[in-house]
C-alpha cells in the first residue's frame, strides 16, 4: 500500500519491503529532518521583525538546538516523538515564561513523522546496498523506492505545514 493505492508485489518487492520495514532509524534523524523542513523552508528567516527591530531567536525541535544559539528568545517546535509532547498546558505555559520561548506543539492528527520515518528507512536501506552490483530487476525496485522516498518527503513537508496550523492553544488557569 502506498497512500490510497494498493498493488500486488513480486517476491523480490516483498523481500525489499520487509527489509525496509525492518530497517531501524534513529528518531533523532527524523527530528533533524523535521527541523530542516521547518527552519529552512517554512521559517527561513533567522530573525523576528518587530516594528523596525530585528530579534534573533534560537531554533529548537523538541530538545535539540538547530543551528547556533543566539542567546535570545527561543522558538521551539515539539513533535510527537518528544516526551514533552504530552505535558500539561500549565507546564507549557510555565516553561514558556521561564525560558523566554514560544512553544509550538505540532499536531498529532497528521502523519508527517511516519512519512519521514518511512523515507529515512528507504534511504538507509539503499545506502547499505551496492546497488550497481545488483540485478537489473532489483535496481528497478530500488529506483521506485527512491521515488517513493522523495514523494513521502514532499508529502511530509505539506503535513508539517498542516501540523503547525493545527496547534494546541494553551490557556492560563484562572486562579
List PLM regions with ranges:
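Extended alpha-helical scaffold and adjacent linker segments that couple domains
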Residues: 1-175
Amino acid at each position: 500500500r502506498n497512500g490510497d493505492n494498493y498493488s500486488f508485489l513480486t517476491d523480490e518487492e516483498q523481500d525489499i519491503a520487509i527489509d525496509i520495514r525492518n530497517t531501524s532509524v534513529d528518531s533523532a534523524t527524523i527530528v533533524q529532518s523535521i527541523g530542516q523542513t521547518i527552519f529552512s523552508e517554512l521559517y527561513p528567516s533567522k530573525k523576528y521583525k518587530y516594528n523596525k527591530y530585528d530579534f534573533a531567536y534560537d531554533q529548537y525541535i523538541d530538545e535539540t538546538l538547530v543551528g547556533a544559539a543566539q542567546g535570545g528568545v527561543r522558538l521551539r517546535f515539539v513533535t510527537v516523538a518528544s516526551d514533552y509532547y504530552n505535558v500539561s498546558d500549565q507546564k507549557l505555559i510555565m516553561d514558556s515564561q521561564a525560558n523566554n520561548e514560544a512553544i509550538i506543539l505540532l499536531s498529532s492528527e497528521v502523519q508527517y513523522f511516519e512519512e519521514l520515518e518511512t523515507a529515512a528507512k528507504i534511504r538507509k536501506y539503499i545506502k547499505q546496498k551496492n546497488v550497481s552490483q545488483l540485478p537489473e530487476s532489483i535496481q528497478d525496485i530500488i529506483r521506485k523506492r527512491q521515488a517513493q522516498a522523495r514523494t513521502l518527503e514532499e508529502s511530509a513537508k505539506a503535513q508539517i505545514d498542516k501540523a503547525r496550523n493545527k496547534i494546541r492553544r494553551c490557556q492560563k488557569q484562572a486562579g
